[in-house]
């Protein structure tokens, strides 16, 4: 999509897009940027998807219609789950009229597991996964993101957490795109964390460095994510614009997922890649889903290739 000064219609669309993108993808990372014009050539489809959600829902997400509280889940893709990876760290984020604050953050060691599913799930879900998703580390076995979001919110509430208005999930690759824009940070032990090494650091190097002290590894991960958030908050308006542009790539790769408890907002989000929804309505899609059930954190080292020669599905 080209944006030119002579094409007022496209210019208005670009401005709407930047407003909405900041509301939907960066609501948990940076304040809303009001008016920016930006050009892109390779993400027309993603822009149309996000524009379809509408500014009214963007205001809902950003807390302009009442304070919102979200669980931000950091998915560790070293151990694959249906939505990307197991939860390695989390934050509880409050947004009030675009003002963002972190109420609490921690690693998965802080999260309390249950023996049975914390809420009623569809029969096909129970048949596939049983009660395994009652444990946080297995709570997102289903590739249908709303399933994971509902379980996460209920598990959080059961351990005494405040009521949540939604969930967002990201992974280390999303962080790499952010660091490419805002610059490197320094880890707790003095290492320089950059866009080029953050994925390897979080999915491989930390496991070697803290081989005998997993608790310290989890603390180091939380510290790293907290510093990234702080750097984004302190970035200039120009940098924030570049962050929005950079995050179109991980959005397209299904690395940024969102769920809202607001029925209207969720209905709109579910029609986009942001919703992580597996649709039951034709024309829908086949999807190859990878699950690591060994707890070995080996997915970082694996290359996968999927070839489909013939595929059909019976009516039942």
Regions found by a protein language model. Give the residues of each.
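Non-catalytic, solvent-exposed segments at the cell envelope interface
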Residues: 2-316
């Amino acid at each position: 999509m080209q944006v030119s000064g002579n094409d007022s219609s496209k210019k208005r669309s670009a401005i709407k897009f930047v407003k909405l993108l900041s509301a939907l993808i960066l609501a948990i990372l940076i304040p809303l940027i009001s008016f920016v014009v930006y050009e892109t050539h390779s993400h027309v489809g993603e822009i149309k998807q996000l524009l379809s959600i509408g500014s009214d829902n963007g205001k809902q997400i950003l807390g302009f219609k009442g304070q919102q509280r979200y669980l931000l889940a950091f998915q560790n893709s070293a151990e694959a789950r249906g939505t990307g990876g197991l939860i390695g760290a989390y934050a509880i984020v409050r947004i009030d009229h675009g003002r963002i604050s972190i109420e609490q953050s921690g690693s998965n060691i802080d999260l309390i597991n249950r023996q049975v599913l914390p809420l009623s799930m569809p029969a096909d879900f129970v048949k596939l996964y049983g009660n395994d998703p009652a444990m946080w580390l297995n709570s997102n076995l289903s590739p249908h993101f709303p399933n994971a979001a509902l379980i996460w919110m209920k598990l959080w509430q059961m351990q005494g957490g405040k009521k949540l208005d939604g969930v967002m999930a990201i992974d280390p690759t999303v962080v790499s795109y952010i660091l490419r824009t805002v610059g490197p940070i320094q880890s707790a032990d003095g290492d320089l964390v950059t866009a080029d090494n953050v994925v390897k650091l979080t999915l491989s190097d930390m496991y070697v460095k803290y081989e005998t002290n997993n608790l310290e590894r989890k603390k180091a991960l939380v510290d790293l994510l907290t510093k990234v958030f702080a750097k984004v908050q302190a970035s200039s308006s120009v940098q924030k614009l570049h962050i929005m542009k950079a995050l179109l790539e991980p959005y397209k790769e299904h690395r940024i997922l969102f769920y809202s408890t607001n029925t209207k907002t969720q209905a709109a989000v579910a029609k986009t890649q942001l919703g992580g929804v597996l649709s039951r309505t034709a024309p829908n899609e086949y999807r190859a889903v990878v699950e690591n059930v060994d707890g070995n954190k080996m997915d970082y080292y694996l290359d996968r290739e999927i070839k489909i020669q013939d595929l059909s599905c019976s009516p039942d």
